[in-house]
Amino acid sequence: MSMGNKNKWWKNAVVYQIYPKSFQDSDGDGIGDIPGIISRLDYLKKLGIDAIWLSPVYRSPQDDNGYDISDYQDIEPMFGTMEDMEQLFAEAKKRGIRIMMDLVLNHTSDEHRWFLEAKKSKDNPYHDYYVWRDGEEGIYPNDMNSVFGGPAWKWVPELGQYYFHQFSVKQPDLNWENPKVRRELYDMILWWMEKGAGGFRLDVIDQIAKEPDLKITNNGPKLHEFLRELSRETFQKGDMITVGEAWGATPEIAKKYSNPDGSEFSMVFQFEHIMLDQEEGKEKWDTIPLNLVKLKKCLAKWQNTLYQTGWNSLFMNNHDLPRIVSRWGNDGKYRKESATMLATMLHGMQGTPYIYQGEELGMTNVQFDSIEEYEDIETLNMYKERLEKGYQPEEIMHSIYARSRDNARTPMQWSGEKNGGFTTGEPWFAVNPNYTRINAKEALEDENSVFYYYQKLIRLRKENPVFVNGKFELLLPEDERIFAYTRTDEHTKMLVCTNFTDEEVSCPLLDEWKAGEVWIRNYEDDREGNILRPYEAVIIAFTGK
């Protein structure tokens, strides 16, 4: 039985996210799969990561990239078999790597056995597994909309009822008020723990306690009661790493999710920092330049509020976000420098860092010539909507280049060979044409690559407890070009200093710290003086205090 979150293994762990469809194909069908992941475990071991967060591989009609699950206890055939999954657990374990499953507990697919039963009659034992309201066709129970657009209610004529769906019409919401539903989900989680799962990422977990009659979707009144029961019945029975996805979380709410007593989760994914380059009140496609002062204040707030009262997850990339080197860095002349600078800024903070596949290579956004080359449903819908509203095609494509989820979903770039070494067949989605320059084979042959810089950062975190325990203090809060902070524990004081621009910047802090030991720097030569070169990053430490 787990007793709280103090000194847990995951506090100095680094997690690597895999989007299986785009990682490595093993059988030439153009789709990444589980045997492909197994074949790349040695690469991940070399990087130094401790856990893999695996995007969903359960059986699914793939209406929403596998987040619409039709069987929690089976594997989607395009990814492999249950035997493959068991082999992945075993091979990862041999290398000291845990597998975090991606769990959706808010809804299932409408093709799940429970829902097929639930639709048969109001008396069916599975009917109350979902959220139903009586009504008349065309007169919705209320005016709530789904996240993906359109009403959140779907009429089922044979029952004379509507079911509630916060997401796609093919993703009916589960009824967490029903103890039988909760028990089924807990038993399923325990089954995966028995199989070898080392942790879970919980998709849209802040929406399970919805109360549609009151139009409450996230952070419903019973949310934390449900989460404590979930944790008690499942995660606390093993040494799990757990992270809840909560778009609307504030630091105060995150304290509950990641309470050091271990009653809910290890940590939470919050997205406040990721929204800072989006026009307020507009859509994600409406971008504005990143204001560094705002980014610093936002991250400092999370660092300071959760210090000793919760735990942060540190990330800039995932399967839904554009590539960070293109977003906040410079993916041309200073690609290596800005990729490593951003990594330094993030990994120096308190929390568990997440690396998204290809981030460790400095993979960039993609710019396909025509909308026909894109796959992501959100992107295709936006293109159509904005054309109808009178936007120019070039203007829309510019937004897609900056923001499309497809930027994260182009296949992993393993080598300069055809299709980047991802597949011997026809890839499900085109590889970014820059794979001939940016790929893992090149990176592994260049000791100054982004890959080896990430490897060094990960090693530093493992060797120096100040990364885990040190108190955070933001320096130069109003500086629009430099992001600098210290971390301090009883033995070490560490300075993280980064230049967010493509120009040289003088930084007087470097004079004050010149007697310290340089732990890592993203330029090959050490240089005296207080000038930071374009996108330069350095960590300096005084130890023995």
Kindly give the residue locations of the regions a language model identified.
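Active-site and adjacent substrate-binding regions of carbohydrate-active enzymes
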Residues: S2-K545
